[in-house]
Amino acid sequence: AKDLDRDDLDQWDVDVFKPIPSDGSHPTYDRDEVHEIYREWRKLFNQYNPPRFAVAEAWVNPDRQHLYASPKELGQVFNFEFAKKNWIRDEMHEAIAEGIASAKQSGSTSTWVMSNHDVPRNASRYALPQVSVPGHQHQLALDWLLRDGKTYVEDRALGTKRARAAILLELALPGSAYI
């Protein structure tokens, strides 16, 4: 990890690496001990000109995202709140407000993640009925996927239009866009 100046590391993905502190505990979910490790990484990142940064793939509560995005740690965190939301105005507004607040708290730029390998793709999600199920993100989309697309009517044309509109919204927001 000391040679971060290599061209082939542009897409280095450390979400599969789970650092284990010396006490033997396993920080699989938002453990405070992991921040000591990330502060050590920051020392290494700062040895380069310009300093390197990393983006945390941390599915944590929005009120803890700032810890990962801090300039003393990784520098950015994926804001998954945006990817969790349905095509419902109030849900999208909430995600945007949380993302901007988290960025201000950390002193980092805000990030916007529309989709990734952990959630159904936005065009598929938005093609299905948009029903908010408290405590469960994309419940209808997950059910639809698990049952081979047979539980709900999919409107692909509508899903594509909504996905395009959502991406344009994402690109208009301040910060970094991860589509």
Regions found by a protein language model. Name each.
Residues 1-179:
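Active-site and adjacent substrate-binding regions of carbohydrate-active enzymes
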